[in-house]
Structures are given as structure tokens and as C-alpha cells.
Regions:
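Core SAM-dependent methyltransferase catalytic element
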Residues: 163-184
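Conserved alpha-helix/loop element of class I SAM-dependent methyltransferases that forms part
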Residues: 2-19
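Class I SAM-dependent methyltransferase SAM/SAH-binding core
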Residues: 23-67
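A short SAM/SAH-binding and catalytic strip from SAM-dependent methyltransferases
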Residues: 77-91
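A short acidic, Gly/Pro-enriched loop at the edge of an enzyme's catalytic core
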Residues: 66-78
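Conserved beta-strand signature within the Rossmann-like core of class I S-adenosyl-L-methionine
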Residues: 106-114
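A short glycine-rich, Lys/Arg-flanked "PGG" loop and its adjoining helix->strand segment in the class I
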Residues: 93-105
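C-terminal alpha-helical "lid/dimerization" subdomain adjacent to the S-adenosyl-L-methionine
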Residues: 114-163, 169
Length: 184
């Protein structure tokens, strides 16, 4: 099996302030958003073992992001921290529809993810991070996935436009991107 590893992407979320309720998609493993915003976070992950590894901060629920079991317009924020890269095209499409449904009007969808070019000559793509969660907490996680398609801010644009999200902010480089989207 051949691996492609990105350079260490420097990401700092310490200066981001979420207001209200937060749904964290793929919130297992490192529990990045829960470590940042503590008990205001509802972390969901389809894998129980990933949630078991997450620090006990906030609520943890085994759930599929393509079938969110929440009331309409319940959350103020939804976060996806290196989660979309694990979804296939049908799942991404369904996720954006579900995210739009459970976000309140003017709610924000925050996405941090890997940029994976179409040239998948390696079997596995690994995004490596230097992640600042707070002034006192820096971690160095890696996120690996089978490399089977392109993945970028431009690629997922078709899905969030279809779901009727408005792009507020885009930051990207050759190996990662950040998107801030709003439900109108």
C-alpha cells in the first residue's frame, strides 16, 4: 500500500468563537471541536470506536451525517473537521441537504478539509496537521483515507450550492481548505 502524506498544514481554530449550539460531524477521534467548545458540542460519528476515543466533553452520539436525527432548524453551527473526505459523492450530497435542514436560519456551516488532486497514484491520502485548538493546546493529528477521487473546495461547491448555502469565506492552499457557509 502506498501513502501520500501532505506537508504539515498549520490550522489555528483558537480564535474562532461559535455562538449557540454546535453539531460536529465526524466528531470522534481527536474530538477537535469538543476540545475547543466543550459542552456546547454534540459530536456525531458513524463509528462507535472513534467516539470512544474522544474526550468526554459535550454529548457524543453514534449517527450517520446523511440521516441526522434532529429537529429542523435546531443548531446554530455545524462543523466538519476533515470529515467530508471520508464521504462518497452520494453521502456528500445527502449531508449538505441534511445540514441545511437542521441549521437555523443564518446558521453557519464550518468546513476544514483536505485538498486531494484527481491524480490518485497512491492508495492512501494522509493529511497531516499542526493544529492549534487553544493558547495551551496544540496537537498533530493525521487523517488518512483511501484515495479514489478529487476532493477540493471547488469540487464540493456543486453540493453546497445545490443545498442553497451561501459562501461567506474561503481560504485554501494546495493541500487544505476552509469554508464558511451560511444558511439563508
Amino acid at each position: 500500500m502506498e501513502y501520500y502524506e501532505t506537508s504539515r498544514q498549520k490550522i489555528n481554530i483558537s480564535n474562532i468563537h461559535f455562538s449557540g449550539r454546535i453539531l460536529d460531524i465526524g466528531g470522534g477521534g481527536e474530538g477537535v471541536i469538543a476540545r475547543h467548545s466543550k459542552e456546547r458540542v454534540v459530536a456525531i460519528d458513524i463509528r462507535a470506536d472513534e467516539l470512544a476515543e474522544t474526550p468526554d466533553l459535550g454529548l457524543k452520539i453514534i449517527m450517520d451525517a446523511c440521516n441526522l436525527q434532529f429537529l429542523d432548524e435546531y443548531f446554530d453551527n455545524i462543523t466538519c473537521f476533515f470529515s467530508l473526505m471520508y464521504m462518497d459523492l452520494t453521502q456528500i450530497d445527502r449531508f449538505f441537504s441534511e445540514a441545511y435542514r437542521v441549521l437555523k436560519k443564518d446558521g453557519i456551516l464550518w468546513i476544514w478539509d483536505a485538498t486531494m488532486p484527481l491524480d490518485c497514484s497512491n492508495d492512501v491520502f494522509v493529511a497531516q496537521l499542526d493544529l492549534t485548538i487553544s493558547e495551551n493546546e496544540v496537537i498533530t493529528p493525521g487523517y488518512g483515507v483511501s484515495w479514489f477521487r478529487e476532493h477540493s473546495a471547488e469540487f464540493i461547491e456543486q453540493f453546497y450550492i445545490k443545498a442553497k448555502f451561501e459562501q461567506l469565506e474561503l481560504k485554501q492552499n494546495s493541500e487544505s481548505f476552509f469554508l464558511k457557509l451560511r444558511k439563508n
